[in-house]
UniProtKB/Swiss-Prot annotation:
Forms long, thin, rod-type structures predicted to consist of stacked beta strands. Contains essential helical regions at the N-and C-termini, which may embed into the inner and outer membranes respectively, reinforcing the envelope spanning nature of YhdP. The inner membrane-interacting regions, particularly the P-helix, are required for YhdP stability. The C-terminal helices, particularly C-helix_1, are required for function, potentially in anchoring the protein to the outer membrane. The lineage of its organism: Bacteria, Pseudomonadati, Pseudomonadota, Gammaproteobacteria, Enterobacterales. The chain crosses the membrane at residues 6-26. GO terms for biological process: phospholipid transport. Residues 1203-1237 are annotated as: C-helix_1. Keywords: Cell inner membrane, Cell membrane, Lipid transport, Membrane, Transmembrane, Transmembrane helix, Transport. This is Intermembrane phospholipid transporter YhdP.
Amino acid sequence: MRRLPGILLLTGAALVVIAALLVSGLRIALPHLDAWRPEILNKIESATGMPVEASQLSASWQNFGPTLEAHDIRAELKDGGEFSVKRVTLALDVWQSLLHMRWQFRDLTFWQLRFRTNTPITSGGSDDSLEASHISDLFLRQFDHFDLRDSEVSFLTPSGQRAELAIPQLTWLNDPRRHRAEGLVSLSSLTGQHGVMQVRMDLRDDEGLLSNGRVWLQADDIDLKPWLGKWMQDNIALETAQFSLEGWMTIDKGDVTGGDVWLKQGGASWLGEKQTHTLSVDNLTAHITRENPGWQFSIPDTRITMDGKPWPSGALTLAWIPEQDVGGKDNKRSDELRIRASNLELAGLEGIRPLAAKLSPALGDVWRSTQPSGKINTLALDIPLQAADKTRFQASWSDLAWKQWKLLPGAEHFSGTLSGSVENGLLTASMKQAKMPYETVFRAPLEIADGQATISWLNNNKGFQLDGRNIDVKAKAVHARGGFRYLQPANDEPWLGILAGISTDDGSQAWRYFPENLMGKDLVDYLSGAIQGGEADNATLVYGGNPQLFPYKHNEGQFEVLVPLRNAKFAFQPDWPALTNLDIELDFINDGLWMKTDGVNLGGVRASNLTAVIPDYSKEKLLIDADIKGPGKAVGPYFDETPLKDSLGATLQELQLDGDVNARLHLDIPLNGELVTAKGEVTLRNNSLFIKPLDSTLKNLSGKFSFINSDLQSEPLTASWFNQPLNVDFSTKEGAKAYQVAVNLNGNWQPAKTGVLPEAVNEALSGSVAWDGKVGIDLPYHAGATYNIELNGDLKNVSSHLPSPLAKPAGEPLAVNVKVDGNLNSFELTGQAGADNHFNSRWLLGQKLTLDRAIWAADSKTLPPLPEQSGVELNMPPMNGAEWLALFQKGAAESVGGAASFPQHITLRTPMLSLGNQQWNNLSIVSQPTANGTLVEAQGREINATLAMRNNAPWLANIKYLYYNPSVAKTRGDSTPSSPFPTTERINFRGWPDAQIRCTECWFWGQKFGRIDSDITISGDTLTLTNGLIDTGFSRLTADGEWVNNPGNERTSLKGKLRGQKIDAAAEFFGVTTPIRQSSFNVDYDLHWRKAPWQPDEATLNGIIHTQLGKGEITEINTGHAGQLLRLLSVDALMRKLRFDFRDTFGEGFYFDSIRSTAWIKDGVMHTDDTLVDGLEADIAMKGSVNLVRRDLNMEAVVAPEISATVGVAAAFAVNPIVGAAVFAASKVLGPLWSKVSILRYHISGPLDDPQINEVLRQPRKEKAQ
């Protein structure tokens, strides 16, 4: 022990000497280290297994220890990468190393270190810990610290991209059990710079591992795309992923046990199917915890905005629990994935659907089809990854919505809860004001007003059971309540049971609830159109059986829906009229439908005992049977609303029934759109049948007819037609191009009792006619109807007293044939009466029957052609116009004019027409319309005239020639012609047109009147004559007047002038001899009386007459007809008296210079006081009155004889030179006598035809002196 200090001292001294020698050796050797560089590199290569290169090695010894500097170090890695350092500086502190017993460096700096590896950095590896390799041992344990300057690490990122990790500066400190680092790291790749991160690490080294500690990262606007896995890059079209973040990671015992991520700002974008989706975060935090042996990831607040829509505030937690040993038989519990979430908005997840589609294409397809939306309030899922059929769940949601996917109906406003597991669970659901589209099943979305349901299930080794309880749904027009149970035993057949009560307030909405996939399209088509309304309070749905065996052809199950519809509207065929106010029971049994009702209205008829059956949906046929009773007039309108409109309906339009009918109806209706078959029989009792083409009605129609669709066939029917008995039968046939109707008719009728002829015609007919007829009607399917009628009969037993040519005695055969061919627009009526009379006509059908053109040909052997233009042409035998006018005056033509419209162009030709007591020979009368009315032309032997019947102007009659000489014209005792108008009836000219008459040459009663003009104006009961004129060439009469034809106040007034140069010539033009010769005349008159113009009433005659005659002679005083004016004033009687008294003085004639007279008439008494005859032999002045009513005279006459050579002889010579000579001679002889007579006075009285003339005074001539 005593020698120990010495030994130690000696040892220490030796060590110091050795160390000194070593240091000295190093001082000498280190500068020459580069010379041993190859050997040193080979040694390193053999130790590492990698070839190492260096361009230079330099070293030196400092006070603290050696320093080393190496240049251009390069090594190749096993994965094909490389490691290189531009320069390494190393300064070893020997004394500190000895003190701490580990390497202590004053400086260890790597300049421009380049590390390139081809091995991708993945999340998995052979070991989860950071084990030390040779390099890690060197850098983590051998170096107490080191620095990296301008270095770079190149590696493959998880996405497969090569990334460059630039390290501008990094300092690493190593303690024996603690490792710390701090610096800047910049990541870049081929796509550009990805940001700069600050890195801090504080790790502890236990058992050779970096097993404990924390790592902190911080980066602003860093691109995370390179750090995402290759799967993400291959499957997600990620465009951007820029975030500002901080992160903490905790390492415990070499494993990552937790961490926190704080995403301050940033977002990502990726390309979807049709648009680019975006995600942004705002201070989103996430916490990762490793709870042995599982993991948990939680986001306490989802501060996420996707596609511009913020997520609602919620939380999300994911946990993975590894497989556990729980003991027992199955001592292993599968690893589980547990999910907890709240306030998830499904619509906000649409952006991640492409990710889901890549993870699970099936899930992506469902998501894309359903497009879910709504809110999941809470969600808890425990999913055993090795036994997913044992998943446990609990959830609640509100207002979920999705679109239909396959047989999953769409929904909206779907709220509810879910609890339990896949093996045993419970679902409660509710919907309000929601629509559930269910295409291929229902034709319209189910419109749910309020729905509640509770559904539970049990799924185990015995089978599957699904129960629905308290199902209460109020949908559009339907309220259903009930439940169901579905059983699927493990080794047995399934069974479904349903019991539900149903009510509806609108049966027309039933089409919404027919499952088309079960019932078939055609049946759903049919029922959708058939049920158009109704109510049901107690409908019942019952189902029991194996759904796979539906429709239970062998009664191994039952499906039945019994619906008692009330107030229903039901259309058994879509194109047929719907039945209304119907109480009908619908019984859906398996694949059939049975319907029945006690009674229903088919239009206006009643159907009873009605049944409608669809025995088998697959056969697609509806069978209907019913008894029908109702008014026949309602049958036609009913079929007009059916597909039989163009056939049976059109027939019933042409043949319209009225009265009650009884029928049996059977309908066979295919549901696939094929034609309906309708059969039945109709019984008629005292009905009526309106035949529209004939516009006539058969009454008291009795009999039967049957029908098959549009084909009708009747038995012999009896009826009454036009008040006459009739036998009729008819049939119809549906042809290839048209629907055909045939009617056979026959009877024996009395024409006078048919009720269709005017009464005046009936009175002229008697007897009966046997006839038969056929009516054929064609109703083309794509055109208008056509028809033909043929009637045949013999008028042998008929007696006619109608005017010729319609007169006929009984017993004389007269065959009649009438044919009609036409359509809905027109028809042609032709016929033959006897052998010589044919007629042809064309009629137009519109709002009123119109005769377009017609021709009647008497004495014709063939059918004459129709006129070329619209009009009527009558070629008649000799006719008695008076008889026809008398017949028409009795109203024979009134009904004809009201029932039809006739053309205005009418031509009548006859060899002789008796009218107005005159025969008009070879007469042709043509009436034709003009622009302003109608023009009538009449030509014949006795007339050539036109009458313009103008609409807005007076009628104009232009008569070129008229000869009217009635053969039986009667004259009065005074030889005046009779009136052309009847005297027994009052003439009413109200409504007569104004007229202008211009006659160039007129003859009346065999006498030529010459020119006759007149203008006639009608105003109420007043007829006004203006511009009246009769100009014979020898005399001219003008007249204006008025005829007031008021009953009880009739009045006629006329005024005008009568002029002429020679009164005897004017009189002789009419064949009358007048006693006045060579005298001009001028008469003005103004007369009025209270009767018709041609019936002057002397008692009411008033007026004034101015008469002036020029120089002339009065001869042959005893004149008759032409001397009325002289006789009226008794001039003729006075002359006779003078001739008698002075027969030696007066000769055969009396010459005068003038005759002037003014006479006024008052109530039939004519007065005059200035009648003056200025004669050559005497002057005669007369005054007094003539009573025209009593026809007597009361006149005074003064005769002043005068004979003067200067006056009288000169006047006589002026009148007639020969007479003047005689007067001159007489004046010489008679001068002494006349010189003694001065004045003669006479009083004339007595009857007008035999006046009494008494001389009152004969006054001698006084002397001149006196």
